[in-house]
């Protein structure tokens, strides 16, 4: 028997409790600009910490390999119904434990080792799981990569030529570091012309898509994968949306194909997040995310920094640091010392190594969640520029850190 009053983390494991408290302070006192990070609601976190973590539920609602699943069936069905409504999908699988496993599930269902896939080059803003040679997708399949044109937009004409030349079985759309809107309809036409499936990985853009401020790939793609965190502001996990005709294949690929028992506490948290995302408040939030990103990018340009693609049409932007003679690694460290959290990121055709890079990636979802508006976004842009102009000046770092402290105190994450 467990005594809730005594079985607290603080009592059971003081070392872990201390680390959690330190991380809480960091999140409250630092400005979070990593585009793939966000803050979940207390309701989402409560679902993840619920008794549902105790329940094994191999299978799917109404067809389980374990008894006692009548209530987790309700939870999973709610998650399925809500995410279908959110994106207008015919079918959904909410069991993938991550976005990478969602992608792997589609590959496992529809491809065989040695098949040809075509995806956006990691060097141009794609994702590891879209065919990078260091990932299983690049090891198991023959990969053809498309990228950006001279204007740093997706080179759709080159992608079309590659598709006709190589006849891929599956085309992957989506990116992890691309700021503009993706023409999913055009990519769908390319896929159809060569007899390929189209899979869209919308992990970065899912929250924006749910709110209608970014193009929805669901009407155009055979499969749409996503994480449930990032801009969607849910728990860490994955989802696959699909045409109804592929539901059985995808479900079998996830279980028993690549996963065993689903994480029911996480699926409950996904359901809560989907309900939050269906609200009018969430749409307003995403509109602010896009506006804050636009203001942040414009401010950086005014301060002499170059934004890859020249602008952002979403929540994310890549900053080219070469004109400032500073690497992404050094910029990440300097901004971190000022309590502004970013991640170093390669720019298109980056001459630096992946652990060094010539750029940083910035995103607006987390700062918007804590209440920042255009005025704060402009201030943050100027603070970033101040640090990048004097990355080794202790007085500048101290001044910016003090301004960050004042700003984060006015806009707490959790009251």
Swiss-Prot record:
Protein residues bound to (6S)-5,6,7,8-tetrahydrofolate: 122, 126-128
Gene3D superfamilies noted in UniProt: Aspartate Aminotransferase, domain 1, Type I PLP-dependent aspartate aminotransferase-like (Major domain)
Keyword Iron: no
One GO BP: tetrahydrofolate interconversion
PROSITE patterns (UniProt xref): SHMT
Keyword annotations from UniProtKB, A to Z: Amino-acid biosynthesis, Cytoplasm, One-carbon metabolism, Pyridoxal phosphate, Transferase
Family stated for the protein in its record: Belongs to the SHMT family.
Name of the protein this chain belongs to: Serine hydroxymethyltransferase 1
């Amino acid at each position: 028997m467990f005594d809730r009053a005594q079985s607290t983390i603080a009592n059971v494991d003081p070392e872990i409790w201390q680390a959690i408290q330190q991380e809480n302070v960091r999140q409250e006192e630092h400005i979070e600009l990593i585009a793939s990070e966000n803050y979940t609601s207390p309701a989402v976190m409560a679902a993840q910490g619920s008794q549902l973590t105790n329940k094994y539920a191999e299978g799917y609602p109404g067809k389980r390999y374990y008894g006692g699943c009548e209530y987790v069936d309700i939870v999973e069905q709610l998650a399925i119904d809500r995410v279908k409504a959110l994106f207008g999908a015919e079918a959904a699988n909410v069991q993938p434990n991550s976005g990478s496993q969602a992608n792997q599930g589609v590959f496992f269902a529809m491809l065989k080792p040695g098949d040809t896939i075509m995806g956006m080059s990691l060097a141009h803003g794609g994702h590891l799981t879209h065919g990078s040679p260091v990932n299983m997708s690049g090891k198991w399949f023959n990969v053809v990569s498309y990228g950006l044109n001279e204007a740093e937009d997706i080179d759709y004409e080159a992608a079309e030529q590659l598709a006709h030349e190589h006849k891929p079985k599956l085309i992957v759309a989506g990116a992890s570091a691309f700021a503009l809107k993706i023409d999913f309809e055009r990519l769908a036409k390319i896929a159809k012309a060569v007899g390929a499936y189209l899979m869209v990985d919308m992990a970065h853009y899912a929250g924006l898509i749910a709110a209608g401020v970014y193009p929805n790939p669901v009407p155009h793609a055979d499969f749409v994968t996503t994480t449930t965190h990032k801009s969607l502001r849910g728990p860490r996990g994955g989802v696959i949306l699909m045409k109804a005709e592929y539901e059985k294949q995808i479900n079998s690929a996830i279980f028993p194909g690549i996963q065993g028992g689903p994480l029911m506490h996480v699926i409950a948290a996904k359901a809560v997040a989907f309900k939050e995302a269906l609200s009018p408040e969430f749409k307003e939030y995403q509109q602010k995310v896009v506006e804050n990103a636009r203001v942040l990018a414009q401010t950086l340009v005014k301060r002499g920094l170059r934004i890859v693609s020249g602008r952002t049409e979403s929540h994310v932007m890549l900053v080219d640091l070469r004109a400032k003679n500073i690497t992404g690694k050094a910029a990440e460290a300097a901004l971190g010392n000022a309590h502004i959290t970013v991640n170093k990121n390669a720019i298109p055709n980056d001459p630096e190594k992946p652990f060094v890079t010539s750029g940083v990636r910035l995103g607006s979802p987390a700062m918007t969640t804590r209440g920042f508006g255009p005025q704060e976004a402009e201030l943050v842009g100027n603070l970033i520029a101040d640090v990048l102009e004097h990355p080794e000046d202790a007085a500048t770092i101290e001044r910016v850190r003090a301004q960050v402290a004042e700003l984060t105190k006015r806009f707490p994450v959790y009251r």
